[in-house]
Curated annotation (Swiss-Prot):
Record has Protein transport as a keyword: yes
Gene name per UniProt: ATG2
The protein's role, per its UniProt record: Lipid transfer protein required for autophagosome completion and peroxisome degradation and peroxisome degradation. Tethers the edge of the isolation membrane (IM) to the endoplasmic reticulum (ER) and mediates direct lipid transfer from ER to IM for IM expansion. ATG2 binds to the ER exit site (ERES), which is the membrane source for autophagosome formation, using basic residues in its N-terminal region (NR) and to the expanding edge of the IM through its C-terminal region. The latter binding is assisted by an ATG18-PtdIns3P interaction.
Catalytically driven reaction(s): a 1,2-diacyl-sn-glycero-3-phosphocholine(in) = a 1,2-diacyl-sn-glycero-3-phosphocholine(out); a 1,2-diacyl-sn-glycero-3-phospho-L-serine(in) = a 1,2-diacyl-sn-glycero-3-phospho-L-serine(out); a 1,2-diacyl-sn-glycero-3-phosphoethanolamine(in) = a 1,2-diacyl-sn-glycero-3-phosphoethanolamine(out)
Gene Ontology, cellular component aspect: endoplasmic reticulum membrane; phagophore; phagophore assembly site membrane
Name of the featured protein: Autophagy-related protein 2
Biological process (GO), any one: autophagy of mitochondrion
Chain positions covered by the region annotation Disordered: 218-243, 1188-1224, 1746-1765
Compositionally biased tracts (Polar residues): 1188-1206
Species of the source: Pichia angusta
Amino acid sequence: MAPQWMPQNIQKRLLKYILQQLSLFSEIDLPNLDVSLGTSSKVNLRNLELDIEKFSIPGMYMRSGSIETLSLSLTISDGVNVDCAGVNITLTPSLTPGKPNSTDQFSLAKSTADLANSVMFEDNVVEDEDIKETPSVDSNPLPPEIKDYRMSNMMAKAADMALSRLQLTVRDVKITMILETSHMEVCIEKVTLLSKEGTRYITVEGMTLNAIKPEVYSGEGVDNVDNSEERDETESEESEDYDDELMQTSFMADNKDDIHNSLMESMMFATQTSESVYMSATSNVFSSTTPRASTYENHQPSAVCVAYVSKCSVQFDGLQNIENMQVNLGRIKIAASPIPECLSSVIQSIRNLVRLSAMSTNETAGNTEKEPESDNTTLLNTLKIDEICVSFESALLKDGNFALDNTTCLSLSDIRFEQKNASFSFGSIAKIRLSRNDSKTELFCFDDSRAPNVADLGLEILNNDVSRITLICPKSLNIVVDEHLLTLAARYYSLMEPVIETLISVISTQTPYSYSNTHTSRFALHDTANNQKSNEFHAQTSSIHVKLQLNDFCITITISPITYDSQEGRFDTSSILFEYNDPTLGEQYASNQFLMISNLETSSAGVNKIRSFDSSSLQEIWLKTKIKTIVEKATLKLNFDVLIKIISSFGKLADLVRKSMVTSLPVARQKKVRMGSSLFLNATKMLKNCVEIKHCTIIFSHICPHFGDLKFSLKDIFVNFLQDGTLHSYVMSVLIQRICDSVHESLLEAADPRNKGYPMMFAKFKDNVGVHFKNCSFNYYGEWITLLESRERPREETNQSSSASSATSKKRQVNFTFADVSIGLVPVNLKSKIEVVIKKGIADLLIGTDGRSKLQSSFSSLTLLLIDDVANILSDKESKSLRHWINANNNHAIWTLNAILKSKGFVPVSYISSLFLNSTFESERHLEKRMTQAFSGQKIFASIDTKIHADALAVDLCADSCQCLIQTLKDLKQPVQFSFNEKYKPMTDEVDVFKDVDETTFSASVSVDVDNLEQTEIPENEKLEIVEDFFDKNLNSDSAEQSAIRSGSLSNSGTKSGAMSNIIFDDNHFGHSGEEFTTKVIPMAIGVSISNVTIKLYDGYDWKETQTTIKNAIRRVEDKAAKIGDNMNEVTEGSTSEHVRSVSNDSTELDTEAVNELLYESIHVGLLAGQDPQSFYDNINKSISNCGGSENVSEHNNLSPGSSSPASVNTANSTRSAASSHNIELGKVSSRRVRLKRSIYHKVLVELENLDLSNLTMVNSEPHPTKNSIVFSEDESKDDSELVSRMDLSVGSFKVVDNVPTSSWNMFVGYLREAGDKELGSSMLHAVIDTVRPVSSLAASELVISVSVLPLRLYVDQDTLDFLTRFGEFKDDRFTLPALDEEEVFIEKFQVNSVRIKLDYKPKKVDYAGIRSGHTNEFMNFFILDESEMVLKKLVLYGIPGFARLHKMLNDLWMPDIKRNQLGGVLSGLAPVKSIVKIGSGFKELVAVPLKEYEKDGRVIRGLQKGALSFAKITGGELLKFGVKLAAGTQTILESTEEALGGDGSAVRLPGYKKNTKSRRRTSPSEVIYATSRERSLFGHNTMSGAVFHRNSFDSYGEEEEFLEGAPALDGAGTQDAEQHQKSRFLVPAVFKSTAELPDVLESDSDLDDYYDESDNEGQKIVSLYSNQPENLNEGLQTAYTSLGRNLDTAREAIVSASTRAARSGSAQTAAREFAKATPIMVIRPIIGTTEAISRTLQGGINILDPEEKRRSEEKYKNTKKEAG
């Protein structure tokens, strides 16, 4: 040590030299240096600047460093004491990538070596070093030399001796990290360095991490106002650190050489000595920013405390090699509130640095050298942390305390980490807990009851060839989640999510540049096994218990131990259990398990191929994923009330969480470049994750009383998360059932269980939601509505919540797609079922922000199928056997849903080609806005407005299926019932009528009159005179009111007194209700529009129950009649001839005894005693097939609608019963089998065009009065009625076509052409039905009906009328609904306009029994009506109790009017009278026309000409018509005669006539009819050679009718030749072993006969001789010539055929017989041809005189030319 007499200047320079050797300080100014050398030497330095060149921190660059005061105290006893204060260091990230080389490393060994060199006075070494370290100005500097700072033994001993007596104390340390968008600050109160016995001890006290920029939220408990005043002056002096110029000179430099180059200019212009060149450069820079520093000082942001460390102790051994390092940290406190914003700004700066670093890496890649491998010495032996406390809400003060104590804090206590050796390390956390101090509840903790001394978390790290990390949680974990914690987590999630995404993007951006450094291909896969060691991570936890605390209940989640293995990429747990706990139940409080997830496993090893489906076409595609989660089974069983409670609580919780989530931080994201789509890029999509649930069961119990449980069974559920954020989910199998005791009702199931190739449900979630349904069968149960209505629902809360949610929600769109979907409709009381099959359909649901929703949907190919009893539905196995019968060779046939349902027993009854359904759901707020902006024309606004449009509707019905369909549709919902008291209020509250009467008012007058009573008494002898005229003598007679009702109008009551004269009657009182609307909002409006409706009515019956019932009734009648006949025969044989003669004389007076039965109120089966039972089968078969002519009459048996009364018993002269129903005419067939199935061809066709139906529901409330008030309304003058609903039906045009084979007429009902063309937009039928409540407070409702009909043209054939009567009167008790309300509907008012009718009527039989019974209407059947005209007058009726009474009143009012006033118009249509009337009108024209012309202009000659012309036209036309009738009558007689003699009769005129054509029938029950390959199949358009004929085919509905009408009849039963027989094939279904088993499958042995015979019999139709009329005389002559030639050819063929057969016979007798058979044809056929030629010629002449006659004939008669075409 230097002596005391050494000069002060020399001492300063000596100390300066020593300090410079420490490589710590830059140039030291001597004025700031105080030295006092001696035994107790002291050195004081002020305002020291650190040498930034000597400091090199990996990844960091020191921009500046300074020390305010530094004191060195050197004593002999205490050694060296260094005390620093006010240390300020500013750092910035370095752009130099990779690890620093050895020359840039700063260590304690380097500084110690410099100190040792200074002690040994090796000046030459320092000079050489300065020369070597002088940077070159060259742009390409050489790499610096690597210097080893290993000391010699002497130097090491000297350094160790020096450090052993060194004590370093640093106070007020401030380290500032400057980033591009963030400034962070670390403040340390005190740092102490001691050395004892070779061990270094470093102690850091009071370390704080502050965030300066940007301004962040500090947390709760402090005022977040700028606290810049609290900052000291030294902070403001550092404002120059943020200047942009300095950022450009140092921060943006790549390395230190660039920094030296940037400072060359300042070196050249330095004014100071060479020792302060660097200071002069920096001083110039700082001086330039001095003015700005003063302005920036006022806007300096306040520092927000982020973290605080109370104490940190570091202990290590060694000097050059640090060993046995032990780090002990005290209590660490962290405020979590500012962390998200700080991380966001830091990561944003780091991302920019990474981008610049990656660019500079390419330039310096060639200068990199391989670093030596690090040794395996352990640097850190022990790390201990007393506690880490994180507050998620409170702010952190500068003194290290939280501003608030009652906040949510995470505490990690006693953290230890030890490194045993270089390959093994372990650590633990003793206690982990999340608590809230206000409630003293632990939200996150581990169970210490079993092992209190075991740490909560354990960690092991093993570094050998494989780096293995093992994380163990040996204790069970308890987590309590409440609303506060959930909202807090949601807030931090919303803040941290963009930060994490940005961090991931920063890490991922380094990967492409690392590829470029190695000069490899961008798409090459790198061998990671050779470059780095593989890492493994294993985790094992104990059970986890999560308690979700809601309002008044909680949900507990128990998770079984979780294991994770990174090598296999497997994360699994055995079970996850959810329990529901409700403490409000009191003693019944118990945990209920409601959800169980079994065997959850997540795999992330390798790439898995996942089967999926395209979101638009549902085509199969394959995707790839690295993460796949599989759940073996998930079971949910929950009470429905609890489910509603949970959903409500979660809804409120979701709203709370949504409100707590803040807007994401403005993190600048890197702009993504979208590449165009290509086939290569879209070849295989990559998924983020795939979740598969193999089986899921959901059960909701106790939904409502008597409902049972609702069970969901889902199989093979897949949820795919795509990279673009899209979520795809699909379910392969879905089954939803209602289970109540033994009842299992399916709500949703697979329509075809065999079709498993496509998912039943597919959903796509992105911006919009898309849902696809395929092969699904939905079922609607009417009973469910009744059961679910019994459940009470809080309406007000739901409305409020829905309105609140709709106000905050955004626009959403849900797209639905349907393919091969069926909807089953099950009624409430009936056993029938309707299936609606939808082939394709789409529906778009748009949910708006204003509460308005809109549904737009379209469906194609809708088929409605019906079955009478669900018990008759065949199982899949049974129906599958029938399918094999149809197509036995194809085992992979694809069956449509229509075919499958038909094979199960359903009958198609309706078909719609396309259907459009649009619905609008309006909110009250939106409707009020529309009402204010509405036009004057619109007065009604519906909350739900539905419009349905269909292009074409086809309906095919039989009598039984028609009733079944109507009753089933009516029974789809239980009608609303009201009690009698709710309807009419028969009881009222008692009223004290004398309550306000003063009893003393008339007391005085009474007393006065008492005195004079004697004067007013009547004498006893005076007789009382009674005025007889006082009472109305006509009270018992018909009053004027009754006659007014009959005439359709009302009149006065006719009372003589004038007391009621002041009452004013309003005739339109009942018409006011609802006719003039004010602007109002109604609940619902439904509009249905159908362009074309076709209704086909078939004969026969669809249901097997109906057929069986009729067959059994026939057998019973047959047996009874046979017994009676046997008894009569016995009586006849035992009687004498006289007795028999007396009985025969009385036979004309007594009817033969008959056996009768009435079926379905429309079928009357009757058989005379002793009659041949064969007639039953003949008549029934003939009735359905109608193969006979119109003249056939059955005299002794019938199958008729009517009753079994004695009046309906048929005699030998009667063909009808006494009832209004008609018999079914029966013919003769050889077989006794009955064919009752649906006929192939329809009998009646109803065509409707432009059908519009609108239904307005005005009131949605249902009054249930509870008070029996006296008056209904306070204001009696006010109308208290209420319009409940209005139904408006309009039909543009309708026509009923007659297709009965025995009827030659074409149209049954249509528009009357003579009335003129219809107006555009007018409707043939318009009906308005209003449902009103006369008293709005009562539930009783009435109807107001208004009907208008345009003029009608009727062509009524009696056979068609019988069919329609029998069809309409059919009633099966199975489809009769229970009479819940026996009261009939009351019709308040009925109004119908006058209807003009022109009628043609053709009777065919007369019911004489009905005439004898008094039914005078039966006399109409004696006359044929032709163009009879009548008018049904306008009627207005009031107060009608039911529709039956309405029908009777209409008949009683219209018929007398027609008989009284319009009898002439009716009689003018009689065939004998019509010609006379026409000729009379001609004579009238002959006289009237000249008179009219004379009166007009006085010209007589022109008048006579016009009159004569009119007379000739009318008279000539009638004479020609008379000639046509005469010729036609003659032809009819001749054809009947020919047919009776063995000819073909009128059948020759039928199109497609073939001589001697017979129907093919089975001769035995075991015979199967064959189809040759040349014939067309009955099952479809495709030819099926060898298919067994079966009418009930299973192909798509709608195709059968097209080919059946043109199908050829089956020819030849036993006359098939050998060649044709060889071409046929015999096919037996695969399920049958022999043909003998075929009858067992069918329900009766006559089923096959039902199918074959009808095709032949129904093809034979009667053709009128007036049809196909020629247009003019020329065409008439051509037609006459053709018909004459045809008949002559027929006669010639008969002669040739007879000659041929006679020549082959070889005997004269046979030849004579053959010629005798052909003689009638040879004689009669030429005469028939002549009469037909005359008739056709005359028809041509008639059509020339009156062209309208041709159109009338085409309208009236069937046109065989069109049918043949």
